[in-house]
């Protein structure tokens, strides 16, 4: 009698493990450098070390990946903003300079290369025709203005600003200056010059 031998299952290689946060960070850097439309999936795969099936499984398509990168950027940027503005015992001028310095540290890469604001640099063009990107961009700007307004209102209530100062208007002024700094950083203006723009903005706000 011939015995049927069970075929031994073929051993498969262990699936390659990816760190989703590290991959998202590398994808963000790719978008930051080339923009959403200018960054190909092949470039993202090369940056993350993931093939297309793995990339799709982890993040979905390129659009979904970009939205994740944009949301993560706003989260980190707003954390830095709130940390800079949080200490109520710090004078307003000092708090605002900490805010601008924190953003400048984001606008320059670890090796000192200027890259500006990820949201302003990559999302503003796409937001014209893409409602999802437009929504995430607008919400990030709204939260930034709200955080600045809350700190400026506190300063007015403590007598650091004129009693008739409008915190909402001053918040928009502060964020508009930040966006100008971001664009200038992207254009290659040196960090010292950008910080001087921030300092003068703080002087105007504090009166």
Which stretches of residues belong to each language-model region?
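Hydrophobic alpha-helical connector segments
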Residues: 68, 82-115, 167-174
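Short, solvent-exposed amphipathic helices
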Residues: 76, 132-143, 150
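Helix-turn-helix
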Residues: 2, 22, 26, 30-64, ...
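Amphipathic alpha-helical segments used for helix-helix packing
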Residues: 94-95, 110-132
């Amino acid at each position: 009698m011939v015995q049927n031998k069970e075929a031994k299952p073929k051993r498969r290689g262990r699936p390659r493990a990816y760190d989703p946060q590290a991959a998202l960070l590398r994808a963000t850097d790719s978008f930051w450098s080339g923009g959403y439309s200018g960054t190909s999936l092949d470039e993202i795969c090369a940056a993350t070390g993931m093939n297309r099936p793995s990339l799709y499984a982890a993040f979905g398509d390129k659009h979904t990946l970009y939205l994740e990168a944009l949301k993560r950027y706003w989260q980190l940027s707003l954390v830095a903003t709130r940390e800079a503005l949080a200490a109520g015992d710090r004078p307003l001028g000092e708090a605002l300079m900490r805010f601008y310095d924190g953003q400048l540290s984001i606008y320059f890469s670890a090796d000192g290369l200027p890259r500006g604001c990820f949201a302003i640099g990559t999302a503003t063009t796409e937001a014209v025709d893409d409602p999802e990107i437009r929504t995430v961009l607008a919400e990030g700007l709204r939260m930034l203005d709200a955080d600045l307004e809350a700190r400026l209102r506190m300063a007015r209530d403590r007598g650091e600003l004129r009693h008739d100062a409008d915190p909402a208007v001053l918040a928009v002024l502060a964020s508009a200056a930040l966006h100008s700094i971001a664009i200038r950083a992207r254009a290659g203006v040196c960090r010292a010059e950008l910080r001087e723009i921030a300092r003068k903005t703080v002087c105007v706000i504090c009166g």
